[in-house]
Amino acid sequence: MALREIIILPDKRLREISKPVAEVTPEIRKLADDMFESMYEAPGIGLAAIQIAEPVRLITMDIVRKEGNGKSDPRAFINPEIVGASAELNVYEEGCLSIPEYYAEVERPKTVRIRYTDLDGQVKEEDADGLFATCIQHEIDHLNGVLFVDHISKLKKAMVVRKFEKAAKRGIKYV
């Protein structure tokens, strides 16, 4: 495993649309391992490959760690897609490792049904709700070049983007 640098707004690579993974290879498994290590170090509960400048449709998550009970449930999702979503919405305060120290309430479907391939190459479908639903939608957005600030008001988004652009010009690195 290797710790990888997480790219930060306004890095334009965050807006790239990630390419599908054709096959689960040892390289994809190693990338997932690197992503878990980088995600835990940050610390975070979800990471899309594009956030470490790898434009492939791979997500790692461990939402159990957020509960602070010392347990862990690392999961990888290859080529994840939402195949169904509830009409009922939920509001959750989101943050992002690529937009450090900024949080905002985002409204998303309360439950979603996802289809993905696991690291063993098995295609699966699963229902997600609560934090899992919020996190998987947030990470799938990354694979499509969408950031959580795209879901907030234009004024708030403009303010946060400007803040990160100014910091980048001054060479400030968020850690």
From Swiss-Prot:
<dbReference type="InterPro" id="IPR036821">
    <property type="entry name" value="Peptide_deformylase_sf"/>
</dbReference>
<keyword id="KW-0408">Iron</keyword>
<dbReference type="GO" id="GO:0043686">
    <property type="term" value="P:co-translational protein modification"/>
</dbReference>
<feature type="active site">
    <location>
        <position position="139"/>
    </location>
</feature>
<keyword id="KW-0479">Metal-binding</keyword>
<dbReference type="Pfam" id="PF01327">
    <property type="entry name" value="Pep_deformylase"/>
</dbReference>
<feature type="binding site">
    <location>
        <position position="138"/>
    </location>
    <ligand>
        <name>Fe cation</name>
    </ligand>
</feature>
<feature type="binding site">
    <location>
        <position position="96"/>
    </location>
    <ligand>
        <name>Fe cation</name>
    </ligand>
</feature>
<dbReference type="GO" id="GO:0042586">
    <property type="term" value="F:peptide deformylase activity"/>
</dbReference>
<dbReference type="GO" id="GO:0046872">
    <property type="term" value="F:metal ion binding"/>
</dbReference>
<keyword id="KW-0378">Hydrolase</keyword>
<comment type="similarity">
    <text>Belongs to the polypeptide deformylase family.</text>
</comment>
<dbReference type="GO" id="GO:0006412">
    <property type="term" value="P:translation"/>
</dbReference>
<feature type="binding site">
    <location>
        <position position="142"/>
    </location>
    <ligand>
        <name>Fe cation</name>
    </ligand>
</feature>
<dbReference type="InterPro" id="IPR023635">
    <property type="entry name" value="Peptide_deformylase"/>
</dbReference>
<comment type="function">
    <text>Removes the formyl group from the N-terminal Met of newly synthesized proteins. Requires at least a dipeptide for an efficient rate of reaction. N-terminal L-methionine is a prerequisite for activity but the enzyme has broad specificity at other positions.</text>
</comment>
<protein>
    <recommendedName>
        <fullName>Peptide deformylase</fullName>
        <ecNumber>3.5.1.88</ecNumber>
    </recommendedName>
</protein>
<keyword id="KW-0648">Protein biosynthesis</keyword>
